[in-house]
Design a protein with these regions (language model features):
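A short, surface-exposed beta-strand/turn
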Residues: 89-103, 239-252
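N-terminal domain-onset segments
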Residues: 142-220
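Short beta-strand edge/turn micro-motifs at domain boundaries
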Residues: 90-135
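Short, aromatic-enriched amphipathic alpha-helices that serve as compact interaction elements
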Residues: 17-36, 167-175
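Short, low-complexity N-terminal intrinsically disordered segments enriched in polar/charged residues
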Residues: 12-30, 118-121, 128, 147-162
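Short, solvent-exposed recognition patches
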Residues: 193-267, 272-275
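Surface-exposed, charged secondary-structure patches
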Residues: 50-94
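Sec-dependent N-terminal signal peptides
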Residues: 3-12
Length: 275
């Protein structure tokens, strides 16, 4: 009987061994190939990864670190950091669970961040006279703010988290000012744009936003009416920022076409990115 069981395990068509999302992610981003890859893919990724894993398409010298961000009964998210001596980049692997087990369904990252470094290089290369001219033309977003904001927008998750912790007293001060102003006291409705405009125009709020290189405060960036989102920046609907929601039960769910990652920073704060 023991030998018959071993034989069955080797027969063609045998069910793949069940793997957890983190295990699948580690295999999928490893620099070597992964023969049973297709058994663990579904949805859009099944059509994208036809012959190579993501790891085979990434330059071999890059270090790859996988971290489980969330795992429920039906969905899971694993963050992948790619790193070398000069840079870091983050991807997010979204999983679904079906009757056969966990499958990798979608891969997401913050869009258009490649635009940031050339813009920073251009701005930091301006001579003093042109910087002064820039500041006159952009009184609400100075040269120093724009450079700092662009750098923060294109930073790796680990660097944004470190930035938040280093400046947490100012983030808490900004939060208290927004809450004290009661700009978002009413439920979201037709007056939401006016409430948001009033919050961002408040002198104390505006000063702290600019000091922290933040673009704006809003409730609309993450479609969470009970959350405050302090947006760093982004393009179209692909944004990054810091979200505040002290009640975990009210956090929005992560999804490939919504919030692609939500990473806890402590005391009700989260780093978020949208698709």
């Amino acid at each position: 009987m023991k030998y018959l069981l071993l034989l069955l395990l080797w027969l063609p068509g045998a069910a793949p061994a069940p793997l957890a999302p983190l295990q699948i992610a580690e295999q999928f981003v490893a620099p070597t190939g992964w023969a049973p890859m297709k058994d663990y893919l579904c949805c859009e990724v099944a059509g994208q990864a036809k012959t190579q894993t993501l790891g085979q398409q990434i330059p071999a010298p890059l270090r790859r670190t996988c971290e489980l961000v969330q795992q429920g009964t039906a969905t899971a998210v694993v963050a992948v950091e790619l790193r070398d001596s000069a840079s870091r980049r983050d991807f997010y692997l979204h999983f679904q669970r079906d009757t056969a087990g966990w499958k990798l369904a979608a891969i997401r990252t913050l869009a258009m961040t490649h635009l940031g470094p050339p813009m920073v290089a251009l701005l930091t290369g301006l001579p003093p006279a042109e910087i002064a001219s820039y500041n006159r033309k952009h009184p609400d977003a100075s040269h120093a703010f724009t450079v700092g904001n662009l750098r923060l927008w294109t930073s790796a998750d680990a660097d944004i988290a470190a930035y938040f912790h280093h400046h947490q007293p100012d983030f808490q001060k900004l939060l208290r000012r927004v809450q004290a102003g009661k700009f978002f006291a009413a439920a979201p409705g037709p007056n939401e744009p006016a409430a948001e405009a009033a919050a961002n125009a408040d002198p104390a709020v505006h000063t702290l936003l600019r000091r922290l290189f933040l673009g704006r405060v809003t409730r609309r960036a993450t479609n969470c009416s009970s959350c405050l989102a302090f947006v760093i920046g982004g393009k179209t609907t692909s944004t990054v920022g810091l979200l505040y929601q002290p009640r975990p039960a009210q956090l929005p769910a992560m999804a490939p076409d919504g919030i692609i990652v939500l990473r806890p920073l402590g005391q009700g704060w989260y780093l978020y990115k949208t698709a």
